[in-house]
Amino acid sequence: MLSEEVRQAIRRELAAAGFPPVRSSPGSPTVHESFAAYRGWLHRVLVAPMKARSADKPWAAEAAAFADAAMEALYCQRFVTDGAAALAGRARKLLTAGADDPVVLWLVVDILSKEKDDVSEARAQGAKAREAFLRGDTSKVLGMLLSLQQARLIRTGSALERDGAALKAAEYLAASLKEPGTWTAVEAPIYITTLRSIFPGGLRRSNKDLFQPLFHPDRFPEWARETLTGSWEVDLAWDGRGNDWAPKVTKEGWIQFGEHLTKAEKHLTKAWKLEPSQPFAATGMIAVAMAGYSSDSGRDWFDRATAARLDYMPAWHAMSWASRPRWGGRKETMRALALAALETGRFDTDIPFFLVAGLDGLRQELRGSEACRDLYRQPAVAVALQAMCQGYAGAVPGELSHWAWWRALGGWLSGRLEDTCTALTETGTRPIPGEVRSRLADLMSDEILLRGEAALDKAGHTAAWQTAVEAHGKMDFPAELGVLDKLMDIPAEAKPLIDRQRRLIGMETNLAAGEWVKLSADPSLSDWLRLDGAWVGQADGNALITGDGDRALMVHLARIGPAFEARGTIQSTHPENPRFCAGIAFGHHSLDSKPGQWVTAEIVWSKQGKSAMINRSYYNTGILDKATVADFSKPVPWTLKLQDDRLTWTLGGGFICENEFLGRDGNLKGHYTTTSDGRVGFCTRVTPMGSSMIYSPIEIRRLK
């Protein structure tokens, strides 16, 4: 429960921001009812037929019991990961017993993917599930779910692979509409949720011929048809406008935007009036109001959506997005909405956790890491983070260690390191959750820093550590070493941090002297920051990335400065694959633009052959595309030289570019800026499933 003291403190913050609390009562409709309806539909369409057709199998009884348990665990308010191991054990026993029904395998894959971060086992079983589905005569709903499952298991995967699986799911959804009895009027909310929440807007807009019929089915009630038609008009509005900044939108784009949003307002308003107990139309109207095509405010429509279903999270996210300054909103409103989510005290829902998501959005509107840290150090925010973790720990007993990690992060963010230290003792053997790790990485931090700073604080060394950090920022290494040398009785939890700091001092001292320094990726990867991807360090210092999709990025923590010369080798285990894209990244991390100022020297495999280009990481802003014939089945040497914002790059002994200007007036159009805290590392944009890239240690020296 949320204490009255915390609730009143939050209400004072909301009053100061002019943001009324979100109305909530114990009887407010929540997603619990929706999940119950969804489980009932899945049981009718998939699970009951599975039980009937496998009744004579030796594994039938266990499969039936497992299916019921898995459905309850997966399709509920929150999956309790502490129970995943037991369900995963039952899943593996079914596989050993020979269970081969596609419905059973579909549930097995979902459970295995929840058990641990490594989803390779789940992927392998997913392929078998899809094969079994194609051999059988199961509802096309299962084909949709298996395809969506496939897309989900491509964790950071190639857009081509993910989108291909999602489009296949849409085709199966269309086929399922033709099945008698699969979709009835009662399932209208399930259908709308599937269409609006699972298939991204960009995918829908770029495949209009496929999705247009899906938004205009004739079997659902009028309110549902009006909701879908209005939602489709919103998609068409953005398709006409484009995703560029307002000054770059064409006159015709603005005309289409207005015409379609006017139609959307008509259909969505009618849908809401026909059935105000459903949240979908009101949520869609938040975006329409944001663009100025509603007489009522976005907050009015948000209140209507949450009155229909308090924890309809798309409404909360839409309201936060509409509150951004770029849409005429205010940062104060974004902050207030995040706090208002906690103020509801509804720990039986996901609403209080929106505090984290809301602050994530606000952080993107701030400039610089200190401004971001200051946000979390605000007394109201610090107290709210602690209260959120305590509330969920009390409401979900099976997730105590999970929320302990969030408490540890909240304490570290807000500067309450004593809370972090206490929470870390309660995490047990649970590894750091991916969501916690990614938020640390956003701040160029990791678990070593989190644990180390908490341990140093407990030992009374915080002031000394901060002095050392300040000296490091100024590159005053003698002063930093002087502080570290005086630290006595360093706790074991802090030793990895102190040892790493000494290594970085040594590397940067040598770099400052113009010496060559080797940046090796040992198995601990303790000197590297993994911003994306499942990187592995090897005993020989090589870095390995195995195909899990795209956007893998890992940078070394040593600062290389704005001018450097570097060399190494790169190799592919599957050089014949036509969809590879990998290389070397350099630049710096930027909180106000999460991907940061990373520029990549990439080797590209395509159907046209091998080529090389310079790119802004995460964005298709390539400025060079030159053919290369190097044989990447063996280590191929590369060199990079960056000086005065000009890049010279060789690959396999040949020049890819020479003195290519990257500055503000160059081809990257200001997307690269040299800084004293620049870093270097490895990247991939596309790494097909099952293939790997091997990078040798980077040898680098700083230039004057």
Language model regions located:
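Extracellular carbohydrate-recognition regions
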Residues: R502-D532
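Short carbohydrate-recognition loop motifs
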Residues: G533-A552
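Short, aromatic/His-centered strand-loop micro-motif at the edge of beta-sheets
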Residues: N615-T639
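Secretory/extracellular carbohydrate-interaction modules
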Residues: T546-M613
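Extracellular beta-strand elements of beta-rich domains used
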Residues: S696-L703
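Flexible glycan-contacting loops in extracellular carbohydrate-active proteins
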Residues: N659-I694
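Short coil/linker segments at helix-helix boundaries
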Residues: R23-S25, P29-H32, G40, R44, ...
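Carbohydrate-binding surfaces in secreted/extracellular proteins
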Residues: D522, G568, F632-G666, I698
